[in-house]
Design a protein with these regions (language model features):
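Extended hydrophobic/aromatic-rich secondary-structure runs
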Residues: 1-7, 106, 115
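Active-site acidic carboxylates
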Residues: 2-87
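Internal catalytic-core helix/loop-beta-alpha segment
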Residues: 81-117
């Protein structure tokens, strides 16, 4: 699991500092599934973090390798809390290679991002 915080200045409902947006990265059945290492612990930790953010501040990033067909639907990990329809795909290692994601974040004046996944 990756967990990064930078310059957080917003507060969640518990009074804890949060970023402008939470990016939930690679939490899909390809990587996180029953029988894979730390499945239950990872889902629980990620769901706790998702629950700490307003739903309109949660963005999901699905990994679709550049060689994978676009018509093959990617599935989120079983048990993952889905609170937002903001879903972006990445085809390379960095999610910021997706210009739609970059445009969304820039267009909304994003100053801080928290990553988990």
């Amino acid at each position: 699991m990756v967990f990064v915080q930078v310059a957080l200045d917003r507060l969640d409902s518990r009074g804890s500092k949060v970023a402008d947006y939470l990016l939930v990265i690679d939490m899909q059945s390809d990587y996180v599934a029953v029988g894979k290492a730390y499945h239950e612990e990872l889902i629980a930790a990620v769901n706790d973090k998702i629950a700490s953010y307003p739903s309109d501040r949660v963005i999901y990033i699905l990994n679709r390798f550049f060689w994978e067909r676009k018509d093959r639907k990617k599935k989120f990990a079983t048990g993952l809390l889905l609170v937002s329809s903001r879903i972006f795909e990445k085809r390379w290692a960095s999610c910021f290679t997706n210009s739609d994601l970059k445009d969304f974040l820039e267009g909304n004046g994003t100053k801080s991002i928290e990553f988990i996944g």
